[in-house]
């Protein structure tokens, strides 16, 4: 379900929703006008602040799951018993499921890794090399961690399946839609042309619009991810973005 349609869709079905029915979210994004994740979107339109909720995330391409290739994911819920129940429901010989109570960390990592994947694709499209790719992704991981922890996430979540695991998959594998968008941007294509030619959604494009607002709200410096947002908004070209990033003040690594 696309984030921009989620509230209206949930309102349309609210009278049919059992207040004890758990929602399992696979969405990885943010609602642009509110900066909310799915766990905070759902309660209002369904009219139940205590609607049971679980988020399922981690490094997983659907085609590989369908082909029964080994996969590991994480389910996060503030209700530990619910998380365990979903774990038992979904686990199989080909799918390992870990549990977490850090809903914020899992959701924020899942949303922002899509923006970082666009950045990784841009580096690939511009043929900037492996050194640049490694530095950019490392910096992007730090930016996601800085923001997520400011929002209440656990640092360990960002190094787990929903953080580092999903980031590696999305940034480095050709099946990634967001990486593909970045690769084509880095190769010189215009965003409108790219989006018009795709028959699937690249959530990182819309999520990028929330990055600058989040960075300002939580007072976090996020030069890589905000550069992607500015490229998406046609405020910056990929070439100028690289020059800006390389000319940032030399700092101590944190």
Language-model region placement:
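Conserved residues at beta->alpha junctions
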Residues: 1, 29, 77, 172, ...
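Alpha-helical transmembrane segments of multi-pass membrane proteins, especially transporters
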Residues: 55, 134, 138, 162, ...
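Generic structural signal for well-ordered, non-membrane alpha-helical segments
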Residues: 6, 31, 35, 39, ...
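NAD(P)-dependent Rossmann-like dehydrogenase/reductase catalytic/cofactor-binding core
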Residues: 120-124, 149-159, 163-254
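General beta-strand structural signal in soluble alpha/beta enzymes
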Residues: 25, 51-57, 97-101, 160, ...
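Internal alpha-helical scaffold of NAD(P)-dependent oxidoreductase catalytic cores
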Residues: 8, 16, 41, 45-52, ...
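Rossmann-like NAD(P)(H) cofactor-binding subdomain of soluble oxidoreductases
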Residues: 1-68, 86
């Amino acid at each position: 379900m696309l984030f921009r349609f989620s509230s209206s869709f949930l309102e349309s079905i609210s009278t049919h929703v059992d207040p004890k029915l758990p929602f399992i979210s696979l969405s990885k994004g943010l609602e642009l006008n509110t900066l909310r994740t799915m766990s905070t979107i759902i309660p209002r339109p369904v009219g139940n602040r205590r609607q049971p909720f679980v988020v399922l995330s981690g490094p997983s391409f659907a085609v590989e799951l369908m082909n029964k290739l080994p996969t590991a994911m994480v389910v996060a819920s503030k209700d530990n018993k619910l998380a365990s129940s979903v774990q038992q429901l979904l686990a199989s010989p080909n799918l390992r499921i870990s549990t977490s109570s850090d809903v914020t960390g899992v959701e924020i990592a899942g949303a922002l890794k899509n923006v970082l994947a666009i950045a990784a694709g841009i580096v690939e499209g511009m043929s900037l090399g492996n050194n640049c790719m490694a530095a950019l992704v490392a910096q992007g991981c730090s930016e996601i961690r800085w923001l997520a922890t400011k929002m209440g996430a656990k640092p360990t979540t960002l190094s787990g399946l929903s953080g580092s695991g999903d980031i590696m998959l999305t940034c480095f594998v050709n099946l990634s839609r967001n990486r593909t968008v970045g690769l084509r941007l880095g190769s010189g294509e215009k965003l409108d042309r790219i989006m018009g030619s795709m028959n699937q959604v690249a959530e990182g494009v819309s999520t990028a619009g929330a990055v600058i607002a989040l960075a300002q709200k939580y007072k976090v410096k996020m030069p890589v991810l905000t550069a992607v947002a500015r490229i998406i908004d046609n405020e910056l070209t990929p070439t100028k973005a690289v020059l800006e990033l390389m000319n940032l003040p030399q700092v101590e690594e944190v």
